[in-house]
């Protein structure tokens, strides 16, 4: 409780500084929203705003015998067809916690109290820890549902994506079905290229500014998603089971593997041998080389989910955020996204923090975190200026 009070006091000071520095309505609203986003200190927004209106809707058809994917809509209490609100679509990543998780509800509730309509889609595929190309279409369909609401102002529509959801958000925003309506996209902790991301998880390293590898330890979740994805590239069941038995648990434990000639020699397919070589790659360059040897279908999939390769069709303003100590996705992935979108004339802001555990607030000392909180305030304010 003492820590929360200190953070609350610190946030109050930041509120005063921000509003005094730039006393605009949006600056004040941003400052009031921040405690809700960080779940820290008193939350004055809850005291001086009406509770949002909330409802669930299916946003894409289900396969026969399956339940449809649902999205949660949060509307400001005052929103109506006569007084529409700007809106945000929140897209979460692989193995996300779902639209009813308290942390997600807190963020959606705070945004709606601030005056923004919010839609949070759930995806069975992502909740199961899998990523498929069809998830881009899912984001498009969720956006269409949000844009069709009479309480929503179609001139003030944006997408906020977290982690893999940020990559999906950038790809969906370029889809011709919705690209004319997407005013802005904010990607937080996204990857630019699935091949460099997979190689980083394999090699426990990412490329530094001088081109030399920088040691990096991916999280258990990152390793689990990586292993699941790579095993899915092996069609032969016996080969897939052999790779799973030989390597999965060791990768989950964080072990750096070496080539196992006995396992490799028993594999029947080229795809399985390539996955073996990736699992046991001795360096970042070797991992990148192994990815290039994957089957053509796998390479097409990697291309399809890599937003850094698909800027065409995107006309929205692009905002990027990343934690510099991120162990889910290396922060250099957002730097690559920034470079690509700046060249395309789309980048509006790229902010790096030392404040979060991937995309969730970290447990930091307030004094050390104060400059990062200021950066967060300024970044979020820009998004609210697009929406309010």
Question: Where do the model's predicted regions map?
Answer:
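N-terminal targeting or regulatory segments adjacent to alpha/beta-hydrolase or S9 domains
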Residues: 1-53, 236-267, 386-388
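N-terminal cap/lid segment of alpha/beta-hydrolase-fold proteins
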Residues: 29-86
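Catalytic nucleophile-loop/oxyanion-hole region of alpha/beta-hydrolase
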Residues: 99-107, 120-158, 168, 173-176, ...
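Short, surface-exposed "cap/lid" segments of acyl-processing enzymes
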Residues: 78-110, 122-123
């Amino acid at each position: 409780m003492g820590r929360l009070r200190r953070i609350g006091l610190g946030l109050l000071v930041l509120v005063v500084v921000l509003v005094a520095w730039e006393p605009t309505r949006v600056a004040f609203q941003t400052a009031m929203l921040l405690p809700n986003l960080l779940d820290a200190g008193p939350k004055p927004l809850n005291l001086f705003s009406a509770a949002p209106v909330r409802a669930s809707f299916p946003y894409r058809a289900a396969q026969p015998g399956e339940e449809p994917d649902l999205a949660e809509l949060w509307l400001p209490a005052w929103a109506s067809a006569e007084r529409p609100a700007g809106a945000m679509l929140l897209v979460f990543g692989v193995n996300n916690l779902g639209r009813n998780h308290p942390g997600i509800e807190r963020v959606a509730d705070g945004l709606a109290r601030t005056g923004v309509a919010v839609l949070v889609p759930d995806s069975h595929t992502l909740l199961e820890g899998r990523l498929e190309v069809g998830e881009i279409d899912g984001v498009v369909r969720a956006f269409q549902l949000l844009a069709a609401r009479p309480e929503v102002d179609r001139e003030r529509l944006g997408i906020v994506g977290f982690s893999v959801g940020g990559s999906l958000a950038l790809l969906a925003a370029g889809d011709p079905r919705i690209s004319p309506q997407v005013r802005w996209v904010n990607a937080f902790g996204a990857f630019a290229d699935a091949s460099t991301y997979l190689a980083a998880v394999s090699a426990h390293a990412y490329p530094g500014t001088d081109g030399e590898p920088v040691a990096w330890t991916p999280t258990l979740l990152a390793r689990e998603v990586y292993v699941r994805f790579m095993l899915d590239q092996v069609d032969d069941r016996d080969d897939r089971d052999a790779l799973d038995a030989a390597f999965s648990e060791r990768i989950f434990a964080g072990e750096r593997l070496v080539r196992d000639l006995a396992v490799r020699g028993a594999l029947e397919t080229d795809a399985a041998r390539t996955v073996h070589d990736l699992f046991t790659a001795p360096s970042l360059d070797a991992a990148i080389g192994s990815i290039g040897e994957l089957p053509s279908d796998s390479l097409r999939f990697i291309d399809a989910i890599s937003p850094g390769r698909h800027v065409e069709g995107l006309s929205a303003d692009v905002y990027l955020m990343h934690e510099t100590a991120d162990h889910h996705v290396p922060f250099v992935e957002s730097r690559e996204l920034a470079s690509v979108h700046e060249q395309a004339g789309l980048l509006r802001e790229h902010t790096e923090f030392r404040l979060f555990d991937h995309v969730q607030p970290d447990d930091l000392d307030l004094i050390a975190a104060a400059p990062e909180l200021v950066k967060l305030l300024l970044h979020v304010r820009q998004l609210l200026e697009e929406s309010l």
